[in-house]
């Protein structure tokens, strides 16, 4: 375990939202170094489907696996053919593009791409209907979640979060 203790990638966690309800996307990202306990846990998620939750590998097209290898786990149980099509189609393409955007933009070093495993947990609204908007939202949210994972979260950033806590907002919260 100490082998990965000071790794700047392994175990980094980020999240992001992009788009508008119901076609937006919420992404959680966990970055892992291949061979680490974190990577083993991510691969365990891929090997552990359960009813309605079907982990898969993000592909840019059929047979074209994204690098860094990206394991995707849906947060919303599947079963409805429309939601399945949007999750495995628009959402998957957006996630694949977002990962590659992070590499293209230098958020992740292309030289490290084969040594990194990314676990993405994706939430797709069951009432999503605009595949183009879903793909765009997943692309933007994935890139942003990866950037959040590798970004600096120093004491100043934490103080800013604390200061903003009373202005918290969520598109699904309708209360006061």
Q: Where do the protein language model's features map onto the residues?
A:
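Accessory interaction regions appended to the cores of large information-processing enzymes
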Residues: 1-176
């Amino acid at each position: 375990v100490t082998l990965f203790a000071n790794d700047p990638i392994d175990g980094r966690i980020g999240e992001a939202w992009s788009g508008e309800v119901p076609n937006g996307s919420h992404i959680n990202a966990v970055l892992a170094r291949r061979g680490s306990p974190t990577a083993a846990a991510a691969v365990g998620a891929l090997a552990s489907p359960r009813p309605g939750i079907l982990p898969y590998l993000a592909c840019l097209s059929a047979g074209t696996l994204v690098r860094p290898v990206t394991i995707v786990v849906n947060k919303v149980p599947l079963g409805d053919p429309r939601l399945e099509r949007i999750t495995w189609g628009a959402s998957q393409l957006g996630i694949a593009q977002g990962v590659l955007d992070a590499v293209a933009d230098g958020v992740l070093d292309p030289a490290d791409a084969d040594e990194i495993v990314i676990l993405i947990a994706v939430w797709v609204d069951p009432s999503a209907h605009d595949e183009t908007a879903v793909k765009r939202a997943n692309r933007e949210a994935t890139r942003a979640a990866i950037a959040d994972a590798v970004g600096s979260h120093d004491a100043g950033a934490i103080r800013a979060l604390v200061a903003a806590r009373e202005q918290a907002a969520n598109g699904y919260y309708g209360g006061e």
